[in-house]
């Protein structure tokens, strides 16, 4: 696992280099609660926000025990909501993917950073046309905004008045260069709908939008607008959705964010005032010295569990 572990440590290091534009939080003085499983701490919560990769699944495999634990949570009347930094496709595609793996959620029980982007841009419309990069789903749902898919015609870059990067499935150094040159010559708003650096799959990591955008910023491009964990827009949406799903107001102290990543799930939850639950055995921190990582980053979860 040496190469694997080194990759994971590099991800943490790259995330640390982006800390200055991530949300901040005052660390609480309460001790972190340790438990073997998420199942052991369910009674502390009335609602759970669930990251997808590293908590529900890694690539095409469900994480062992997740179905059982979520069934127990539902029996305890705990409201569940998947909150994922995935933007290249629509939320219902995530539901279909999880369903095909044997994990059932309703459409309302999934919020993606794509949805956060669509809602944010509907209320805070940038000047159009908006150049869309990395979309593999339906057209972006933003009323009265002219959205152009730049993959169809990259001669259109100069005619755009704003940009959004959804995903990096088809991204490469050529696209990176085109975007860099275009923004350097003529700075315009750039929205990034996935603040993840990487996503864990069974045997490897995929490189996600924040990785490429951090390199743009390091080379002098202005800061983008981030939409997704750890930034507050997606958590505000999630709170509204939790209260709709549960039919009541649930205090933040009774809502847990379960994630595998310190810089998105845990930092986001801590800065928003939710309880943070780090799951360590299946995602980004698998086979790493978790205590050392927490000390190094000073991002301290309220709870640490190994598995569901």
Language-model region placement:
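Single conserved hydrophobic/aromatic residue that forms the stacking wall/gate
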Residues: 1-12
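C-terminal cap/substrate-recognition subdomain and adjoining C-terminal extension
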Residues: 293-308
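HAD-like small-molecule phosphatases
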Residues: 118-205
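Conserved Lys-Pro-Asp/Glu-containing loop-to-beta segment of HAD-superfamily phosphomonoesterases
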Residues: 226-265
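Active-site phosphate-binding/coordination module
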Residues: 68, 76-153
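Positively charged, low-complexity intrinsically disordered leader regions
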Residues: 13-49, 57
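Asp-based phosphoryl-transfer active-site loop
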Residues: 40-63, 82-83, 269, 274
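Acidic, Mg2+-coordinating phosphoryl-transfer loop and its flanking beta/alpha structural elements
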Residues: 147, 258-292
């Amino acid at each position: 696992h040496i190469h694997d572990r080194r990759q994971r440590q590099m991800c943490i290091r790259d995330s640390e280099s982006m800390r200055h534009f991530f949300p901040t939080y005052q660390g609480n003085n309460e001790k972190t609660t340790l438990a073997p499983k998420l199942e052991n701490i369910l009674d502390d919560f009335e609602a759970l926000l669930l990251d997808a990769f590293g908590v529900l699944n890694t690539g095409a495999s469900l994480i062992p025990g997740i179905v059982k634990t979520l069934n127990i949570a539902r029996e305890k009347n705990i409201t569940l909501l998947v909150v994922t930094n995935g933007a290249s496709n629509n939320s219902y595609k995530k539901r279909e993917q999880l369903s095909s793996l044997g994990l059932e959620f309703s459409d309302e029980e999934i919020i993606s950073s794509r949805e956060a982007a669509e809602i944010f841009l509907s209320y805070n419309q940038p000047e159009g046309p908006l150049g869309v990069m990395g979309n593999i789903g339906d057209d972006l749902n933003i009323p009265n905004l002219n959205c152009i898919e730049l993959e169809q015609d990259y001669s259109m870059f100069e005619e755009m008045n704003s940009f959004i990067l959804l995903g990096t499935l088809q991204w490469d150094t050529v696209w990176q260069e085109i975007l860099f040159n275009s923004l350097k010559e003529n700075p315009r708003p750039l929205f990034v709908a996935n603040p993840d650096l990487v996503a864990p799959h069974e045997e490897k990591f995929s490189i996600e939008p924040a990785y490429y955008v951090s390199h743009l910023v390091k080379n002098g491009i202005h800061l983008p607008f981030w939409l997704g964990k750890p930034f507050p827009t997606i958590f505000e949406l999630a709170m509204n959705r939790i209260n709709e799903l549960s039919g009541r107001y649930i205090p933040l102290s009774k809502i847990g964010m379960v994630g595998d990543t310190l810089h998105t799930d845990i930092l986001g939850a801590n800065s928003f005032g939710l309880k943070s639950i780090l799951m360590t055995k299946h995602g980004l921190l698998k086979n790493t010295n978790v205590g050392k990582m927490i000390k190094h980053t000073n991002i301290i979860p309220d709870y640490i569990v190994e598995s569901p």
